[in-house]
Amino acid sequence: DVFAEEKEGIPADQLVDHKIAVVGITAAVNPGVGIKDISKENLIKVFTGKITNWKDVGGKDQKIVLVNRPDASGTRAVFNKFGLDGATPAEGITEDSSNTVKKIVNETAGAVGYLALSYFTDDKVNPLSIDGVEPTDENVQSGKFPIWAYEHSYTKGEPSGATKEFLDYLMSDDVQNTLLKDQGYLPVTKMQVERDAKGNQTNK
């Protein structure tokens, strides 16, 4: 979920980055909170504890319950960087897995967490649009929806032999358009934008 350059102790200058897939992420709320869209400004206020009741963002009169992933989570790193613009979330419930986050948000009145888009397969939790932009595959691929990240494979130097063959296989149409989607990822080959390690986004 993160670039090698973002992790301390990794010799990123010796590695070659192969971006093989994309994951979109958005805030997930308990269906009872009563909202489907939130501004990024208010999303940041919710997760930093400056807004503590859903009625303040057009929802029900319910206390907001934050559900976070651990500090080491790639999903958390991506959500904090692109959803919260680098702000540090307030303390809340911390769960190790996305499946558990979904379960807790579903079972807890007023709860909000964050999940990859592939977890929104039923009505147990609701995905939030941000500033009116829905968290769809198409909006991630066009760059309209802001919270997404690459899945990386790194090699020490340029790949060769079986390693290169495997990476070529991962970039093939069969994998990009079928296998990745089955696993809940978006094909990197369909992205209309790209990002660098600093988070700068440009059109391809």
Positions of the model-derived regions?
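Exported/periplasmic ABC-transporter solute-binding proteins
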Residues: 1-204
